[in-house]
């Protein structure tokens, strides 16, 4: 019954790039960003001073040492920021970006360390220009490493799609994994082929080979596209890591309300396995909380009436709850929402009306917890997710859909990152041309 992502779901920012952050969150982001910029400035000044004062045989070693220390500091800074932000706002696209950045920086640091060790006894390979060339070549190497790992995951997801089709029937939405695999692997191979074709068919035949400015422009274009590819690869891995952690996170037993997110019901108004799993998980959590603390909670089954459904999903879940031990005063159904965003917004209105400032949980399927948590936070609900399980062949396809949704919700962040990467790529091209 769910409509495509509502415009409300795409007009917000995220984590470190969030629109409408409160002042403490802005101060938190700005403080770490300021420390990072100060460290980068110190590293840059140090490199420039060493370049002028050391003899040529020592410059490369000094520059590489400064870069290595800077990378280690950056990883530590990002890790501290991630740990603090997970406590403040677990469900955040900013956390996904930081996880991806830590991954990229860690691989780059290992790359620099490996390069340094390989040059021991041969200082000639540690020239400043050689180090620069190695650095700008790293994004392609990183992407090649990532495409092996992600390509294998794409293959496994595609296999799960085949099993999903065998059990659930052929539908386009059951091919999310196959579509993502074709887009990623096919797009990456085409990108590499385009780079080689551009150089062989444009740069060389027109006499631009050896022209430092022409090759600098070529470098800027290829480096930007490779960095943007690396960004999406890191975000994909970061989404997987945070999504896995979100599904395994166990909220404290102190909740006043639990929102149950609706999905498709049967033609007769019964709960299909996916939705039944969500409701049963909410019931189990309520029982566990009452046993552990003696505190009862209120169920908010949330979902409107979709096309072809004889009743709202909220009403169907309400009936199921009442016939499985819940009392009438323990259920407040929300029957108007048409997507996850509205689930959270309309349910928040109920919570604010009944008990402002209440502690809230939400129950949904494991692959859906992360995006639901992001939307809950943006709706003003400081809610924690509780995951129900689903069949092994259903989870990968559902998570791919969630990944597409999370990416679509954060277009402004992608644009900002793209602009930063573009500036870095242009700067690298200019440095290459000037120093050539």
Which residues does each PLM region occupy?
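Extended hydrophobic blocks
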Residues: 18-252, 353-359, 363-436
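A structural signal for short, hydrophobic/glycine-enriched beta-strand patches
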Residues: 44-57, 240-241, 246-398
């Amino acid at each position: 019954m769910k409509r495509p992502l509502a415009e409300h779901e795409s007009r917000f920012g995220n984590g470190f790039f969030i629109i409408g952050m409160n002042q403490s969150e802005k101060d938190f982001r700005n403080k770490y960003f300021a420390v990072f910029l100060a460290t980068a400035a110190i590293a840059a000044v140090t490199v420039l001073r060493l370049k002028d004062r050391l003899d040529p045989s020592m410059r490369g070693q000094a520059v590489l040492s400064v870069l290595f220390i800077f990378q280690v500091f950056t990883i530590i800074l990002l890790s501290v920021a991630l740990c603090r932000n997970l406590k403040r706002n677990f469900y955040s696209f900013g956390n996904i970006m930081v996880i991806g950045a830590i991954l990229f920086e860690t691989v780059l640091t290992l790359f620099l360390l490996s390069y340094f060790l390989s040059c021991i006894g041969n200082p000639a390979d540690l020239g400043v220009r050689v180090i620069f060339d190695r650095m700008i070549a790293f994004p392609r190497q990183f992407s090649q490493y990532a495409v092996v790992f992600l390509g294998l995951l794409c293959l496994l997801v595609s296999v799960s799609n085949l099993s999903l089709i065998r059990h659930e029937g052929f539908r386009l939405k059951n091919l999310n994994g196959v579509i993502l695999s074709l887009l990623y692997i096919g797009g990456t191979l085409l990108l590499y082929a385009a780079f080689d074709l551009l150089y062989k068919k444009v740069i060389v035949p027109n006499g631009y080979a050896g022209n430092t400015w022409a090759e600098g422009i070529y470098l800027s274009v290829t480096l930007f596209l490779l960095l943007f590819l690396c960004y999406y690869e890191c975000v994909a891995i970061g989404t997987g890591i945070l999504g896995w952690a979100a599904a395994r996170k166990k909220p404290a037993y102190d909740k006043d309300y639990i929102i149950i997110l609706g999905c498709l019901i049967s033609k007769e108004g019964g709960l299909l396995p996916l939705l039944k799993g969500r409701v049963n998980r909410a019931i189990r959590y309520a029982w566990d909380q009452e046993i552990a603390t003696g505190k009862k909670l209120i169920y908010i089954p949330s979902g409107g009436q979709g096309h072809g459904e004889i009743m709202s999903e909220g009403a169907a879940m309400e009936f199921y709850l009442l016939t499985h031990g819940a009392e009438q005063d323990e259920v407040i159904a929300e029957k108007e929402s048409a997507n996850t965003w509205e689930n959270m917004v309309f349910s928040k209105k109920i919570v604010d009306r009944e008990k402002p400032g209440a502690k809230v949980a939400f129950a949904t399927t494991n692959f859906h917890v992360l995006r639901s948590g992001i939307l809950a936070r943006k709706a003003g609900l400081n809610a924690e997710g509780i995951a129900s399980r689903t069949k092994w062949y259903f989870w990968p396809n559902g998570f791919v859909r969630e990944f597409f949704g999370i990416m679509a919700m954060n277009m402004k962040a992608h644009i900002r990152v793209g602009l930063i990467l573009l500036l870095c790529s242009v700067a690298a091209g200019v440095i290459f041309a000037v120093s050539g």
